[in-house]
């Protein structure tokens, strides 16, 4: 390995530590404390401490190290990961019915992420700020205002991008993980018998001894692996090897040392359960640790916010969410984006959650159900990919799925039991997003099908125009066409009302391919349909934002010259009229109309100069 490659690998691995592992890296702030919360009724006794530590350790090994880093990360689409990517891969070689089921599962998983993303910033920052009550108990009433203030600042700076401050994320998180390791190691040295919990017999004995109560406690243990989906979702940014290298060399050892250090502290001083993380530190280090913890939780929150921006863009490009304003905050990094409506909706939800739950311990009950639900779906989708796409032995796939679900389903079931103590929150938020995504996709499909049914053949219309040509005016007209062989509504209305055509007519169709990026040489396909008609198909990946200026530039390179300021863009604007429906479909239709009215207009989507756009309205019944 060359020196340059080693330096590059080190830099990417460090960057992965700063972004990928923020959520799971801040879990020690609250996980072990929640295991002994009043919900489960466990006393701080050695066998219970050993049991929880053993469960946490083997959860990190089996779920993170084996399931995600060894298996799930094999499933990539041109290097990209994430639940929607896995959904797309799983549906490539299955029947239409199976594909529909897999799509529903993928959308449920994506919806769970929206539910989780509201909780992560709130519980992370609150857990860090709660260190104030250890340093100065009189400051306890200020935990909620301080948490809101920190998160307000974080959401405000989103529109400016995080490129400059983002360079500090990796060093800060590296210091954080080293601090976790040192604090834990210091406590373990004072009480080394805690290392006995590495033996899985303690986890097994815990279940045997405490039976059903130990099953309920899985709802707290799972907090140790929240954020595990980020490893897969961020695979496209950093690559598989750097993410794996960061986990096994820095993150996993630091987490294990800190959890076991907290356990050693509890063996020595059971009263430390009120906040075992901060009580690991000597008195002189408490304030610096509080500041570092706050920075780490802010970085973890930033990673989650960036993740929801990326997921939203992917959902928009794949047609599961209406078009919305997406702002690129960096000229160098295409992945750095800002979506105002998502940013401020998320901010409002996070603030309401902090005010409503008041303490991170109250919010912990809501955490986990979305994470474990996504884990179950990930296992099913991954095994489908292994069977249908990679042609693994069917019996091997069934065995692997059973092993994965033996781990996933008990954790999900334990969290479902927390439904009425907070679990309803991510489920409700996820349900809202699922309804929005399925409504937009299905109603949009029905609308386009209805419009196509009432449209004539494009080839027949062109042939008719060649035989009986209308009046021609100078210039080029571009008509946005959703389907290649269908006459755009705007073209029909222009002929009907104005009875003229431009000298040159371009039918432009935007296509989103099932890949993150499309090579420039494959960007544009040009076909001349007649002496005056051209069809242009522009292809983009779901990580890209279409741009008409770029399309025209590519057209010019291939012989079709179009000057933006000398071209008129004709677009249709549909006014939707709701027909008589059953009540549930009526409500869905109302939601679709509301989403359509607030969707980003096509000129803004494709960055077309407003003074070159002509919109023609039409009424469509749905």
Curated annotation (Swiss-Prot):
Protein name: Low affinity potassium transport system protein Kup
Keyword terms, alphabetized: Cell inner membrane, Cell membrane, Ion transport, Membrane, Potassium, Potassium transport, Symport, Transmembrane, Transmembrane helix, Transport
Catalysed reaction, written as an equation: K(+)(in) + H(+)(in) = K(+)(out) + H(+)(out)
Similarity-based family: Belongs to the HAK/KUP transporter (TC 2.A.72) family.
Protein's job: Responsible for the low-affinity transport of potassium into the cell. Likely operates as a K(+):H(+) symporter.
Any GO BP annotation: potassium ion transport
Regions crossing the membrane: 9-29, 46-66, 101-121, 137-157, 165-185, 213-233, 247-267, 276-296, 337-357, 363-383, 395-415, 416-436
Classification via HAMAP family: Kup (MF_01522)
Gene name, Swiss-Prot/TrEMBL: kup
Subcellular location: Cell inner membrane
Gene Ontology CC, one term: plasma membrane
A molecular-function term among this protein's GO annotations: symporter activity
Membrane topology reported for the UniProt record: Multi-pass membrane protein
Pfam families (alphabetical): K_trans, K_trans_C
């Amino acid at each position: 390995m060359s020196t340059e490659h080693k330096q590059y690998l080190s830099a990417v691995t460090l960057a992965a530590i700063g972004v990928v592992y923020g959520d799971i890296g801040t879990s020690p702030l609250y996980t072990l404390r929640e295991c002994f919360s009043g919900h489960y009724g466990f006393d701080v006794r050695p066998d219970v401490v050993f049991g929880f530590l053993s469960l946490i350790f083997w959860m990190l090994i089996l779920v993170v190290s084996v399931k995600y880093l060894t298996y799930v990360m094999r499933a990539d689409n041109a290097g990209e990961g994430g639940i929607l990517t896995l959904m797309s891969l799983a549906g490539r070689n299955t029947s239409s019915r199976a594909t529909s089921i897999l799509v529903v599962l993928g959308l449920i998983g994506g919806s769970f992420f929206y539910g989780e993303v509201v909780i992560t910033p709130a519980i992370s920052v609150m857990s860090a700020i709660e260190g104030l009550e250890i340093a100065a108990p009189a400051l306890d009433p200020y935990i909620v205002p301080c948490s809101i203030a920190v998160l307000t600042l974080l959401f405000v700076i989103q529109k400016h991008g995080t490129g400059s401050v983002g360079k500090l994320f990796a060093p800060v998180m590296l210091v954080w993980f080293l601090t976790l390791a040192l604090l834990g190691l210091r406590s373990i040295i004072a009480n080394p018998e805690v290392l006995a919990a590495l033996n899985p017999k303690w986890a097994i004995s815990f279940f045997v001894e405490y039976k059903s109560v130990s099953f309920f406690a899985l709802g707290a243990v799972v907090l140790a692996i929240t954020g595990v989906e980020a490893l897969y979702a961020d695979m496209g940014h950093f690559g598989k090897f750097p993410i794996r290298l960061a986990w096994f060399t820095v993150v996993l050892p630091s987490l294990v040392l800190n959890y076991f250090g907290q356990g050693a502290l509890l063996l020595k001083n059971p009263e430390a359960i009120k906040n075992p993380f901060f009580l690991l530190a000597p008195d002189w280090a408490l304030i610096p640790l509080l500041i570092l913890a706050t920075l780490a939780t802010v970085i973890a929150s930033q990673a989650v916010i960036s993740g929801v921006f990326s997921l939203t863009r992917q959902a928009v490009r794949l047609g599961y969410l209406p078009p919305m304003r997406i702002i690129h905050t960096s000229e160098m990094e295409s992945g750095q984006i800002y979506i105002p409506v998502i940013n401020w909706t998320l901010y409002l939800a996070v603030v309401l959650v902090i005010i409503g739950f008041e303490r991170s311990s109250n919010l912990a009950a809501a955490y986990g159900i979305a994470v474990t639900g996504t884990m179950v779906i990930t296992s099913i989708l991954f095994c489908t990919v292994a069977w249908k796409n990679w042609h693994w032995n069917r019996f091997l796939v069934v065995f692997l799925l059973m092993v994965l679900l033996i781990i996933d389903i008990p954790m999900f079931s334990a969290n479902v039991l927390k439904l009425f103590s907070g679990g309803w929150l991510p489920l409700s938020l996820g349900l809202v997003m699922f309804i929005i995504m399925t409504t937009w996709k299905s109603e949009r499909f029905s609308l386009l099908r209805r419009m196509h049914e009432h449209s004539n053949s494009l080839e027949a219309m062109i042939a008719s125009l060649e035989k009986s040509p209308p009046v021609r005016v100078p210039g080029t007209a571009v008509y946005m066409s959703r389907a290649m062989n269908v006459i755009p509504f705007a073209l029909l209305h222009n002929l009907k009302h104005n009875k003229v055509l431009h000298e040159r007519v371009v039918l432009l169709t935007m296509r989103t391919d099932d890949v993150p990026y499309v090579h420039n040489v494959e960007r544009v396909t040009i076909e001349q349909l007649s002496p005056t008609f051209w069809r242009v198909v522009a292809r983009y990946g779901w990580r890209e934002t279409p741009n008409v200026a770029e399309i025209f530039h590519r057209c010019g390179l291939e012989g079709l010259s179009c000057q933006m300021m000398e071209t008129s863009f004709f677009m249709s604007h549909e006014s939707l009229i709701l027909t008589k429906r059953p009540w549930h479909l009526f409500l869905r239709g109302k939601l679709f109309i509301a989403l359509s009215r607030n969707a980003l207009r096509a000129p803004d989507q494709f960055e077309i100069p407003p003074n070159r756009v002509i919109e023609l309205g039409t009424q469509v019944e749905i």
